[in-house]
């Protein structure tokens, strides 16, 4: 059978749409979507036929029912939400690709109230005059960090760019070579520096930088000293770096401001909970740093934001920088950030109700109980499915605490028919996508990042996998 004859058997777009009307698809899906997806499907079939060889053409038949099913599936897929909730079984708490920090259930009411109604975003209720959107978080940030003032923009890279562009445009910023980090997505400190208009002045070497390296680079062109916390990697062995207090003292001596990007934004001493020390914002402010920048959606456990705290005279200048408006946060981010920060007013409340902190500090016994509960629900699902509880380690993720290994419990899955890769793919393509990891031909689900409310979806997904 030649290609022309097979192509002539392809139903027209109008024919297919008429048949779909009988299935009442158009009552559920807008007609414009049905028409577009039908055209795409017909075009896909046409291209496939044109690329077939003689052997494939000989036995090929067009299945109208299959075409209908494909169009229906395409329409439903097009109308469904792309950005949706998933289950994180990877054990990476701050999984960048899965949205980093989870917001607390305690604050969703506040976010919805602001999102669904008019709000006090930029109005002073007392005077009735225009106010500043930043005022909603300034006082709580000052209270929590001890800083003189605060400002919030849409992410930490923007915060660093704003700081450098305000303080050092056209002048030099001194930074250690060992701190010229890449912060993800190929964005690097030197690139941010260049975009800000500041001039990078590297000192020291990758593994060793001394105070005299900084001092020797100071000139009339020096606008600031920059300290970058290398939160996403560690240099081990023959190393030396300059302490924050020493850099601040050097800056004070030469009347040069010190800027620190601490990245992760820790507001609680995590050592109290058995974790490695991670520099807190309060420590930086207490050390006398003029400006500190950090993320809202890493260890802070809030929404994506770039938070700037420090000396009032510098932050006042940043508020007047035209770039500030271009990178400002919206009302949803502000509502989520304010509500998250208010949880920090009591440390126990923060640990209990901010998911990132709760997962970081959760003890192994609690995780083991959750693993046992899920194990009992899964073990009898399918004779081909072998379920075990094993020990493993979770990761912090999000470019934070790279050396920290958190003991955890994982559910491992093996199937007598399906490979681990096939199971992983099926779970990932479930209606509530489940992300796992594979090791030694086993699918692993880490209970540190799986919540009890996820269990019902995991059970349903594995029932589907077993079919």
Swiss-Prot record:
Catalytically driven reaction(s): L-seryl-tRNA(Sec) + selenophosphate + H(+) = L-selenocysteinyl-tRNA(Sec) + phosphate
One of the record's GO cellular component terms: cytoplasm
Co-factor(s): pyridoxal 5'-phosphate
SUPFAM superfamilies, per the entry: PLP-dependent transferases (SSF53383)
Gene Ontology molecular-function annotations: L-seryl-tRNA(Sec) selenium transferase activity
Subcellular location: Cytoplasm
Modified residues annotated as N6-(pyridoxal phosphate)lysine in this record: 298
Signal peptide, first to last residue: none
Keyword Ligase assigned: no
Functional pathway: Aminoacyl-tRNA biosynthesis; selenocysteinyl-tRNA(Sec) biosynthesis; selenocysteinyl-tRNA(Sec) from L-seryl-tRNA(Sec) (bacterial route): step 1/1
Function recorded in the entry: Converts seryl-tRNA(Sec) to selenocysteinyl-tRNA(Sec) required for selenoprotein biosynthesis.
Protein name (database record): L-seryl-tRNA(Sec) selenium transferase
Gene: selA
């Amino acid at each position: 059978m030649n290609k022309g004859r097979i192509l002539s058997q392809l139903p027209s777009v109008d024919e297919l749409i008429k048949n779909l009307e009988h299935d009442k698809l158009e009552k559920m899906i807008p007609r414009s979507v049905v028409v577009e997806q039908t055209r795409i499907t017909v075009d896909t079939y046409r291209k496939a036929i044109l690329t077939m060889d003689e052997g494939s053409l000989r036995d090929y038949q067009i299945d109208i029912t299959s075409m209908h099913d494909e169009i229906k599936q395409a329409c439903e897929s097009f109308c469904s939400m792309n950005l949706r909730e998933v289950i994180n079984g990877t054990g990476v708490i701050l999984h960048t690709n899965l949205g980093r920090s989870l917001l607390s259930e305690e604050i969703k009411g506040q976010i919805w109230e602001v999102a669904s109604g008019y709000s006090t975003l930029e109005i002073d209720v007392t005077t009735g005059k225009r106010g500043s959107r930043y005022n909603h978080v300034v006082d709580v940030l000052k209270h929590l960090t001890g800083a003189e003032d605060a400002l919030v923009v849409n992410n930490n890279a923007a915060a660093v760019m704003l700081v450098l562009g305000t303080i050092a445009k056209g002048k030099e910023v001194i930074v250690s070579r060992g701190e010229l980090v890449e912060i993800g997505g190929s964005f690097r400190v030197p690139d941010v520096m260049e975009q800000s208009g500041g001039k990078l002045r590297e000192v020291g070497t990758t593994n060793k930088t001394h105070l005299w390296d900084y001092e020797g680079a100071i000139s009339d062109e020096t606008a600031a000293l920059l300290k970058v916390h290398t939160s996403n990697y560690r240099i081990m062995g023959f190393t030396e770096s300059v302490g924050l207090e020493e850099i601040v003292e050097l800056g004070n001596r030469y009347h040069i401001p010190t800027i620190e990007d601490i990245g992760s934004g820790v507001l609680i001493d995590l050592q109290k909970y058995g974790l490695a020390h991670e520099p807190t914002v309060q420590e930086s402010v207490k050390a006398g740093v003029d400006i500190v920048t950090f993320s809202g959606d890493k260890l802070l456990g809030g929404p994506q934001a770039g938070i700037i705290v420090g000396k009032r005279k510098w932050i006042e200048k940043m508020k007047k920088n035209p770039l500030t408006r271009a990178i400002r946060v919206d009302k949803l981010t502000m509502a989520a950030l304010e509500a998250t920060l208010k949880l920090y007013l009591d440390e126990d409340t923060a640990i209990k109700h901010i998911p990132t902190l709760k997962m970081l500090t959760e003890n192994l016994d609690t995780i083991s109980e959750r693993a046992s509960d899920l194990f009992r629900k899964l073990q009898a699902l399918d004779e081909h499915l072998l379920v075990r509880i094993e020990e493993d380690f979770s990761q912090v993720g999000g470019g934070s605490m790279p050396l920290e290994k958190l003991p955890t419990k994982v559910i491992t899955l093996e199937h007598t028919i399906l490979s681990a890769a096939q199971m992983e793919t099926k779970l990932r393509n479930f209606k509530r996508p489940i992300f796992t990891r594979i090791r030694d031909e086993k699918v692993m689900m880490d209970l540190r990042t799986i919540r009890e409310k996820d269990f019902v979806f995991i059970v349903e997904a594995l029932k589907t996998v077993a079919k």
